[in-house]
């Protein structure tokens, strides 16, 4: 029984450690959408709501919080529990 309790505690600590893992700094950048002539649907991570959202990228400037797909945004910025 003591071994089972120890393993459960160990699993809990491992889960908490993974859940508090920090996301990359780029995920905290505000979307930078300069006025350019392109029209490219992209995704950025919105830390205020904790999810990836779509925006229109004009094709120039910007920052690294700019993902080609929703999946790429999630894979980079959303830490699984």
From Swiss-Prot:
Localization (cell): Secreted; Nematocyst
CDD domains, per database record: Kunitz-type
Domain BPTI/Kunitz inhibitor per the UniProt entry, residue ranges: 27-77
Disulfide bonds: 27-77, 36-60, 52-73
Keywords carried by this UniProt record: Disulfide bond, Ion channel impairing toxin, Nematocyst, Potassium channel impairing toxin, Protease inhibitor, Secreted, Serine protease inhibitor, Signal, Toxin, Voltage-gated potassium channel impairing toxin
InterPro entries in UniProt: Kunitz_BPTI, Kunitz_BPTI_sf, Prtase_inh_Kunz-CS, TFPI/VKTCI-like
SMART domains recorded: KU
Biological role: Dual-function toxin that inhibits both the serine protease trypsin and voltage-gated potassium channels (Kv).
Similarity section: Belongs to the venom Kunitz-type family. Sea anemone type 2 potassium channel toxin subfamily.
The protein's name: KappaPI-stichotoxin-Shd2a
């Amino acid at each position: 029984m003591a071994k089972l309790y120890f393993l459960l505690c160990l699993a809990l600590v491992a889960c908490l450690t993974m859940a508090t893992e920090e996301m990359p700094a780029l995920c905290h950048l505000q979307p930078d959408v300069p006025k350019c002539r392109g029209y490219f649907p992209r995704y950025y991570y919105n830390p205020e709501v904790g999810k990836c959202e779509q925006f229109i990228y004009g094709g120039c400037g910007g920052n690294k919080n700019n993902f080609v797909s929703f999946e790429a945004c999630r894979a980079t910025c959303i830490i699984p529990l």
